[in-house]
């Protein structure tokens, strides 16, 4: 069995009124998307270095039911940044929800910059 480890995709769980839950799979163009992402990443990297920020947030405020989205985004960005020395990670954090008056679990996709 052959696995395509370089397939660029993300999986997201969504909700709508008609069918309560659905799964959304988005495939990215392997020729265009890496260049588009690299440009975005370079801008974020320069901004982080200029402001002396140690963590770049690539994707933020991902709901707890969409952990698979955070994981597939992390995998997607790691495939693009392979060989650059950057490691993309999924981070779990808690935020206060004033409507329900509880702490909610959220996820973000980050790159931690190493200080020298």
From Swiss-Prot:
InterPro entries referenced in this protein's UniProt entry, alphabetically: DUF5864 (IPR043845)
Source organism superkingdom: Viruses
Pfam families: DUF5864
Family: Belongs to the mimivirus L332/L333/L334 family.
Name assigned to this protein: Uncharacterized protein L332
Organism: Acanthamoeba polyphaga mimivirus
């Amino acid at each position: 069995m052959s696995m395509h480890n370089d397939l660029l995709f993300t999986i997201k769980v969504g909700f709508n009124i008609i069918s309560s839950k659905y799964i959304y799979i988005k495939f990215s163009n392997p020729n265009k998307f890496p260049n588009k992402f690299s440009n975005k990443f370079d801008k974020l990297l320069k901004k982080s270095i200029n402001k002396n920020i140690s963590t770049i947030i690539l994707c933020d405020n991902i709901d707890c039911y969409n952990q698979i989205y955070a994981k597939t985004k992390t995998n997607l960005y790691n495939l693009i940044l392979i060989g650059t020395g950057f490691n993309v990670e999924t981070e779990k954090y808690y935020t206060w929800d004033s409507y329900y008056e509880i702490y909610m679990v959220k996820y973000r996709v980050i790159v931690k910059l190493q200080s020298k």
